[in-house]
């Protein structure tokens, strides 16, 4: 008989020398400032940022949603540490002008805080 065990997810830490964004609820690192694409997005709870890549984030199942810019297939993303829903990942854009968002991540400002080197 094979015993199934749940593997432990280890938290990623971004370098201290870079400006980073962290989960406001548990302070887990989420993204490096260098991965920020745009500050001009709207989430369900207010302003949001678009990132090229993130860390310490889990992804739910994709579903089609009509957003401000049209129909997209998106998956909710959550903090792996505290399980708070942070925003979503763009899986597929149906409009050709929105294709640049595919594979990118939205994190709402209500769920993140600036950490490290923001003097």
Curated annotation (Swiss-Prot):
GO cellular component, one term: nucleus
Short sequence motif Nuclear localization signal: positions: 99-104
Pfam families found in the cross-reference section: Yippee-Mis18
UniProt-listed InterPro entries: Yippee (IPR034751), Yippee/Mis18/Cereblon (IPR004910), Yippee_fam (IPR039058)
Predominant location category: nucleus
Keywords from the named record: Metal-binding, Nucleus, Zinc
Gene: YPEL1
Family note: Belongs to the yippee family.
Annotated Yippee domain residues: 19-116
Transmembrane segments: none
Coiled-coil intervals: none
GO molecular function per UniProt: metal ion binding
Residue numbers binding Zn(2+): 23, 26, 79, 82
PROSITE patterns membership: YIPPEE
Subcellular location per the Swiss-Prot or TrEMBL entry: Nucleus
Full protein name: Protein yippee-like 1
Role played: May play a role in epithelioid conversion of fibroblasts.
